[in-house]
Amino acid sequence: MWIPLLLVALVVPAIRCERKCGECNPEKCQPPSEECLAGLVKDLCGCCYVCGRREGELCDGDFLPIPYRNRGHGPCGEYLECRPRTDLAPGDPPEAMCVCLKTETLCGSDGKTYQNECQLTEARYKQRDGLRAMHRGPCKSAPKITSPPEEASNYTGGNIAMSCEATGWPIPVFEWRVDIGDGNTIPLPSDDPKVSVQSRGGPSKYEVTSWLQLLSIQPKDDATYWCIAKNDEGESSAAARVVVLDFRGSQTSQKGRDNDL
């Protein structure tokens, strides 16, 4: 038993020595010279206040192997905890990173959505205008197209798929329409068995993705297609062309239709 106790007795002073923590004299503490967006916390010696490390920044953790401790990163700020990184490649030296403990989405008094309490705290210290959380969950917002459909082409008889992504709260609902060139748009999929529309949540939080699929395309399918995202706060739309080619590689129709809704 005396060997493990001896090792502990040797290691603990070594850790304290690495930190070089002398006698604490708060009067000698220097105020932070930078803007502290994660709040003020006691330093690793528990004496002076320093700027806390922000979410995603490296930090010093006693759980790391001794050679990798006390690298001068400092402690984490408000609502943050220093944890080992789990995204390192094999063979990389161990590191620790500040992780937010309060991960619930919040709606700020500035009308912006914050992914967690730590992001709202950063904004509050930066703006210094009394920013606070109004309620849990995202703020209401009109849809915004984050990834519009792109022009697609294929030969007669081939298939085409287009996608469209949007964010908003409440979660938007998608509608697809086709402009056949006379200024009028037709909702899809209508009653055409060769046209299908699918939607699902993602890929990001509070985002939705919709797909339009056209099977066995014909010259009549050469047109402009619109994706429209709607919710109670408004709507957003984007368009792209479908070009139908013949087997000589030329376009079957040169209608040049890019009309708005």
Curated annotation (Swiss-Prot):
Major localization listed first in the record, in broad terms: secreted
All residue ranges annotated as the Kazal-like domain in the record: 70-141
GO molecular function: insulin-like growth factor binding; serine-type endopeptidase inhibitor activity
Repeat among keywords: no
Segments forming domain IGFBP N-terminal: 18-101
Cellular component GO terms held in the UniProt record: extracellular region
Disulfide partners: 21-45, 24-47, 29-48, 36-51, 59-82, 76-98, 100-118, 107-139, 164-227
Tissue: Expressed by the venom gland.
Keywords: Disulfide bond, Glycoprotein, Immunoglobulin domain, Protease inhibitor, Secreted, Serine protease inhibitor, Signal
Protein name, UniProt field: Insulin-like growth factor-binding protein-related protein 1
PANTHER family: INSULIN-LIKE GROWTH FACTOR BINDING PROTEIN-RELATED, INSULIN-LIKE GROWTH FACTOR-BINDING PROTEIN 7
Signal peptide: 1-17
Site (Reactive bond): 102-103
Pfam families listed in its UniProt record: Ig_3 (PF13927), IGFBP (PF00219), Kazal_1 (PF00050)
Limits of the Ig-like C2-type domain: 143-243
Glycosylation sites: 154
Subcellular location: Secreted
Key word Repeat present: no
SUPFAM superfamilies registered for this protein in UniProt: Growth factor receptor domain, Immunoglobulin, Kazal-type serine protease inhibitors
GO biological process: regulation of cell growth; regulation of signal transduction
